[in-house]
Amino acid sequence: MKNNKIFNRTFKISLVTAALGLVNSALAADVACNSSGVTITGQSGAVLNQCSINPTSPTNGPEWGSLSAVKMTNSSGQLNNVNASLSIPANRHSSFAVMNITNSTTEINGGIYSITNPNNADSSGYLFELNNSTVTMHNSKVLISDSNQDSILEAFALNQKSKLT
């Protein structure tokens, strides 16, 4: 069989392409869904797909302290069709962010992100709290339902040069 330079080059390019595809798929790490909350720390290419998250704080639980559906820190990745909601308990006063993203780059594709205050708690918090992060959102819904005039619920808090597009 004659050594064909074009065939040889095409074969080598195919091998390189296949190797790059394997590396790319190895870097993209699927994140396990947990209905009470997801934490992503120090991951590059993290992917959370079709997950419903509703963190809860027991009625007798602390009225202060962190409560988040998704915490992403020092990471990059995608959230695809994630439904993250927080129903504020009656005793909850402060320090919650449904989505807490710090030092990360995230693409959000689809999903519903919501805060409800059915117990009319005198509460404050954020739907999205971004700290030194870049977030790009596509086809997502952001909902806040609160009838208590004393509570302060905000959709977005952008801190430390964060960017939301």
Q: Whereabouts are the PLM-identified features?
A:
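Extracellular beta-strand/beta-solenoid scaffold signature
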Residues: V31-T39, N54-K71, S85-N100, I115-N132, ...
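Acidic, glycine-rich low-complexity segments
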Residues: G45-I53, S76, I112
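Disulfide-bonded cysteine motifs in exported proteins
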Residues: L27-A28, A46
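Gram-negative bacterial Sec-dependent N-terminal signal peptides
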Residues: M1-L27
